[in-house]
């Protein structure tokens, strides 16, 4: 097997005992599997839940707290306990654990986005195991990832991972709830995540976690959009991750083995950059962007809204008001209003670096699957 870069996400239910406390035997099982993959030469990035689950007991809570303040306090205590456990276990196999606590704002700035990539890449080059969790102690609702499933998908995307492995206590996706319906059929492989699957998926199945099968499907959908294949399932023993990559995992495989991956810059434009305005384009420009791989020119712009500057990211909508994509503009809003509908040679004097395009193809991301019908 060629060297692969794999993001592994471990949920709270796969780390805790029946009372909700941190289970060191379960943690050791995961560490053994990751260490084995490292010994085989693979790059492994771990996204771990469990900070709140590890911390609420020592704080005196009988069960997982439900208030934001309670969860953040438990995370403050539990994160250090969780990392102590991981560091001690990985040290037994000769590997160093590295902690990274992230918030959603770390992805908004392109500079911080690039720095995060450089940091994780350097850790991998030096043989360390990056262990990532959301910084639950300081995150506010507007700046959260939602859960670690989505965080793992975003990390897998910008690291250009070969696969995202979502380890859970259920061995894959079913057409019904296997806990209540013994006739439920498991999907061994799915080419994509459909809206029907999302609608039928339930919420969290655990009292110690925030995610459920729906959140895993949303994460899988996001990872697939980046060009990352996904596995959702379970396993035990040191070879479980190797088995998963070899196609022998106990779960569901989603997506093609080696899809085309989205460039890191385009990931930032599509999913992380703040959107500063909206540009409306005519049908000709829509077809050029979606069907012919062209840049957006001033002649195709019919309306401009928002107070954006050159090099900001904006949404692009068609004449029906449907978002077709997102891109980084070479014109400030005030200047684009002056030149919309005009030829590029007349308009370029108002653009950043006198570029003829409003949005160059390299700074464009299509967000709509449908193509223009001819």
Curated annotation (Swiss-Prot):
Q: What is its main location?
A: cytoplasm
Which residue numbers delimit the PUA domain? 276-354
Molecular functions per Gene Ontology: ATP binding; glutamate 5-kinase activity; RNA binding
* InterPro entries to which the protein is assigned, alphabetical: AceGlu_kinase-like_sf, Asp/Glu/Uridylate_kinase, G5K_ProB, Glu/AcGlu_kinase, Glu_5kinase, Glu_5kinase/COase_Synthase, Glutamate_5-kinase_CS, PUA
Q: What class of enzyme is it?
A: transferase
User: Where is the protein localized?
Assistant: Cytoplasm
- Identify the HAMAP family for this entry: ProB
Q: What name does this protein carry?
A: Glutamate 5-kinase
Organism from which the protein derives: Geobacillus thermodenitrificans (strain NG80-2)
Organism lineage: Bacteria, Bacillati, Bacillota, Bacilli, Bacillales
């Amino acid at each position: 097997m060629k060297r692969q870069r794999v993001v592994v996400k471990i949920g709270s239910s796969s780390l805790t005992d029946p009372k909700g406390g941190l289970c060191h035997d379960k943690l050791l099982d995961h560490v053994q599997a990751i260490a084995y993959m490292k010994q085989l030469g693979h790059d492994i990035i771990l996204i771990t839940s469990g900070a709140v689950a590890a911390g609420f007991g020592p704080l005196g809570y009988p069960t997982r707290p439900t208030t934001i303040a309670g969860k953040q306090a438990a995370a403050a205590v539990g994160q250090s306990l969780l990392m102590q456990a991981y560091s001690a276990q990985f040290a037994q196999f000769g590997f160093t654990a590295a902690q990274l606590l992230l918030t959603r704002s770390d992805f908004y700035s392109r500079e911080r986005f690039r720095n995060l990539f450089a940091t994780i890449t350097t850790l991998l080059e030096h043989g360390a195991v990056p262990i990532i969790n959301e910084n639950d102690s300081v995150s506010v609702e507007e700046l959260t990832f939602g859960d670690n499933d989505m965080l793992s998908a975003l990390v897998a995307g910008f690291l250009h991972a070969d696969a995202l492995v979502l380890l859970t206590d259920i061995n894959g996706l079913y057409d019904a709830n296997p806990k209540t319906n013994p006739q439920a059929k498991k999907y061994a492989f799915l080419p994509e995540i459909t809206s029907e699957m999302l609608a039928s998926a339930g919420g969290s199945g655990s009292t110690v976690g925030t995610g459920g099968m729906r959140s895993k499907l949303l994460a899988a959908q996001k990872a697939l959009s980046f060009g990352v294949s996904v596995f959702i399932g379970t396993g035990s023993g040191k070879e479980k991750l190797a088995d998963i990559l070899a196609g022998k995992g106990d779960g569901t495989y989603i997506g093609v083995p080696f899809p085309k991956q989205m460039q890191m810059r385009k990931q930032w434009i599509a999913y992380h950059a703040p959107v500063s305005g909206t540009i409306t384009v005519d049908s000709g420009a829509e077809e050029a962007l979606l069907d012919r791989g062209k840049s957006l020119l001033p002649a195709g712009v019919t309306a401009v809204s928002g107070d954006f500057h050159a090099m900001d990211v904006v949404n692009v909508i068609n004449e029906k008001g449907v978002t077709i994509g997102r891109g980084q503009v070479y014109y400030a809003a005030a200047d684009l209003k002056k030149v919309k509908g005009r030829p590029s040679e007349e308009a370029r004097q108002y653009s950043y670096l006198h570029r003829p395009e409003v949005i160059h193809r390299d700074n464009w991301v299509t967000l709509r699957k449908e193509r223009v019908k001819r």
